[in-house]
């Protein structure tokens, strides 16, 4: 899965999303920042919402509070994403169930950067 929309990715290098997105990009994935200010990050144009992204998205990676992630998951379903990835400490069992019912691959409370490091 090559195209990752990273929800919560802005230009703050102190935030986990910034480093994880860079690692994904370095591993050959296309990253798409999704952030209220729609910033360009790591050379990629940002969008305010998932619905604004032109073209298909494989994975929606969620760097948002658990109380907000249900809406993001519903947007991921609506745009036809193949998977949703809820980062460490982002927990919403109901949202994951909705995603699974819609046929999406789901990951919750894990970090792709950590998973990459485990493989290598």
Where are these regions (language model features)?
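Short, charged, surface-exposed secondary-structure boundary motifs
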Residues: 41-44, 58, 94-97, 115-120
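Helix-adjacent hinge/juxtasegments
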Residues: 30-35, 44-45, 49-58
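Conserved beta-strand elements of the Class I
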Residues: 5-7
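Extreme N-terminal starter segment of soluble prokaryotic enzymes
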Residues: 1-3
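NAD(P)-binding Rossmann-fold cofactor-contacting core
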Residues: 14-15, 22-42
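Short phosphate-binding/catalytic loops that engage adenosine nucleotides
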Residues: 28-29, 81, 104
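Rossmann-fold NAD(P)-binding glycine/threonine-rich loop
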Residues: 88-116
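Mid-chain, well-packed structural core segment of small domains
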Residues: 50, 54-93
């Amino acid at each position: 899965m090559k195209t990752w929309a990273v929800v919560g990715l802005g230009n703050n290098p102190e935030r986990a999303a910034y480093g994880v997105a860079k690692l994904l990009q370095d591993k050959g994935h296309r990253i798409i920042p999704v952030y209220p200010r729609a910033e360009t990050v790591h050379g990629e144009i940002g969008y305010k919402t998932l619905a604004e992204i032109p073209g298909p998205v494989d994975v929606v990676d969620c760097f948002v509070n658990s109380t907000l992630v249900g809406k993001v998951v519903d947007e991921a379903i609506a745009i036809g994403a193949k998977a949703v990835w809820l980062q460490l400490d982002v927990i919403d069992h109901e949202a994951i169930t909705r995603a699974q019912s819609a046929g999406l691959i789901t990951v919750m409370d894990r970090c792709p950067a950590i998973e990459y490091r485990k493989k290598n």
